[in-house]
UniProtKB/Swiss-Prot annotation:
Top-level taxon of the source organism: Archaea
HAMAP family on file: HisE (MF_01020)
Protein name in the entry: Phosphoribosyl-ATP pyrophosphatase
Species name: Methanobrevibacter smithii (strain ATCC 35061 / DSM 861 / OCM 144 / PS)
A GO biological process held by the record: L-histidine biosynthetic process
Gene behind the chain: hisE
InterPro entries (UniProt xref): HisE, PRib-ATP_PPHydrolase-like
Pathway: Amino-acid biosynthesis; L-histidine biosynthesis; L-histidine from 5-phospho-alpha-D-ribose 1-diphosphate: step 2/9
Top EC category: hydrolase
Major localization listed first in the record, in broad terms: cytoplasm
Length: 96
């Protein structure tokens, strides 16, 4: 599977869990009262940032921790209603 495809697939799952909650981590974190849910997601992004920094410094689990950070970054984008194409368009804009 191409890298863009897997990101789109993960994004779609996150959107589905936001719109049709099931008993999952992502559904639960997004279904709290609005401010509390946002705070929880942002706390996870901050936590994962720290873990990426430590992993890079210690040369341990950098890929694993980076995927956690990317996942939680995608989660806040979905929560905020950002469309996946906006992200790819911004990457394309910066490429030139």
């Amino acid at each position: 599977m191409a890298s863009e495809e897997i990101i789109r697939e993960v994004y779609k799952v996150l959107e589905e869990r936001r719109d049709n909650p099931i008993d999952s981590y992502t559904s639960k974190i997004m279904q709290d009262s609005d401010k509390k849910a946002e705070d929880k997601i942002l706390e996870k992004v901050a936590e994962e940032c720290g873990e990426v920094l430590l992993a890079a410094k210690n040369d341990e689990n950098l890929v694993y921790e980076s995927v956690d950070l990317i996942f939680h970054t995608l989660l806040i984008l979905v929560y905020k209603g950002i469309e996946i194409d906006e992200i790819f368009e911004e990457f394309a804009r910066r490429r030139h």
